[in-house]
Amino acid sequence: MEKDKKTWSGRFSEPVALLVQRYTASVGFDYRLAEYDIQGSFAHARMLAATNIIPQTDLEAIEKGLTQIWEEIKNGQFEWQLEQEDVHLNIERRLTALTGDAGKRLHTARSRNDQVATDIRLYLRAAIDEIIDLIYGLQYVLLDLAEQHAATIMPGFTHLQVAQPVSFGHHLLAYYEMLLRDGQRLQDCRKRVNQLPLGAAALAGTSYPIDREQVARELGFDDICHNSLDAVSDRDFAIEFCASAALIMMHLSRLSEELILWMSPAFGFIRIADRFCTGSSIMPQKKNPDVPELVRGKTGRINGHLVALLTLMKSQPLAYNKDNQEDKEPLFDTVDTLKDTLTIYADMLAGLQVNPQAMRQAALRGYATATDLADYLVKKGTPFRDAHETVAQAVRFAENKRCDLGELSLADLQQFSAIIEQDVFEVLTLEGSLQSRNHPGGTAPEQVRAAICRARSQLPD
């Protein structure tokens, strides 16, 4: 094939303008699909030979040529050419140069439409497997940290106001559960990714006696796509992945927001290792939580990629349209960003320094055991709404005295309810509050440790 000649140029009376070449070429980013393009071509060629569509000698030449091309790509010796538009035609050009007519026969019973759909699915399947493993790694770090702090008391918040005491381990386990669902979503998404489009050709299938099941088996697909129009035109599997990725990033963004708050002097709950922070060019004292801030910021970009793909697909008629070329950069960046975020997050949390004293002191502020006092009254026969009102009055009284509920005298408390007795002070302690939530899903240290054991049994070794 001549270097400047297009595979489809026979129909046209003049060459494509250089600006149009640059505008329409995708090889600048879809070269990343080369490994998967070659995998698909190996399987396609073997099927063509097995069904006697091409001779065995052509298969041998194609396999040898593809092997050489992959070595050239891995070694940085492959010459990517803009005028060949994309990863597929660049590889085909080189294969034809190496093998002659055998290389020209590889595209029999195949279109770039089903070829690229196959490449993307192979790429995304591998990415999902890697991301799931990274989620497991982060979950193990969360469990290790939660185990260390199963009994470390911190304030639980609603509306960012002190609500009730919780254990820091219990708080961390909330993110374990979020990541558990995130991993399950990806595993479910993988089922829909793992279907073979190859054989759909341009849009209507092919007149050759192909064996799609053979190709599916060789490439590890669970099934074939059962409608040729759908196989080449939809990218819902990529959108589903990006939605799952956006949820993962959203969860990590929430944790990042908390790390940023907890690291501030106003909280002082944690210290993030220096290697994850930067300083200020003007303020010598500054230690800025750049990694959590960037996770929070990059989440917006991942959300944007999801919207971009949805918008890309929303008005396309069947079947394939050139619009779909724009699916790759958002998808690639989503995969790259998510993998980097999960990797760096596991390392950052593993080196987290926790200040239990600061957490405990914060839990003592804000009347975190007020609900425990209300529950105490209910257990002694007071209707909950009456108990709620009684404790609210006691809190206002304590505020005026600038002390905690547990620092009031028994006589002070009995002003609000005569049924309050000396045993009330057991439930007004932070430890008593934690211990009283001793049921599955509760924040009692015993339940936190049980939850950690259960969680470890859910993860692979």
From Swiss-Prot:
Disulfide bond positions: none
Keyword terms: Amino-acid biosynthesis, Arginine biosynthesis, Cytoplasm, Lyase
The keyword Amino-acid biosynthesis is assigned to this record: yes
Associated pathway: Amino-acid biosynthesis; L-arginine biosynthesis; L-arginine from L-ornithine and carbamoyl phosphate: step 3/3
UniProt xrefs under PROSITE patterns: FUMARATE_LYASES
Coiled-coil segments on the chain, per record: none
InterPro entries, alphabetized: Arg_succ_lyase_C, Argininosuccinate_lyase, Fumarase/histidase_N, Fumarate_lyase_CS, Fumarate_lyase_fam, Fumarate_lyase_N, L-Aspartase-like
EC number(s) per entry: 4.3.2.1
GO cellular component labels: cytosol
GO molecular-function terms, A-Z: argininosuccinate lyase activity
Localization in the cell: Cytoplasm
Enzyme type, top EC level: lyase
Catalytic activity: 2-(N(omega)-L-arginino)succinate = fumarate + L-arginine
Domain of life: Bacteria
Any one of the GO BP annotations: L-arginine biosynthetic process
Pfam name, any one: ASL_C2
CDD domains: Argininosuccinate_lyase
UniProt xrefs under NCBIfam families: argH (TIGR00838)
Family: Belongs to the lyase 1 family. Argininosuccinate lyase subfamily.
HAMAP family membership: Arg_succ_lyase
Protein name: Argininosuccinate lyase
Protein's organism: Nitrosomonas eutropha (strain DSM 101675 / C91 / Nm57)
Gene name as annotated: argH
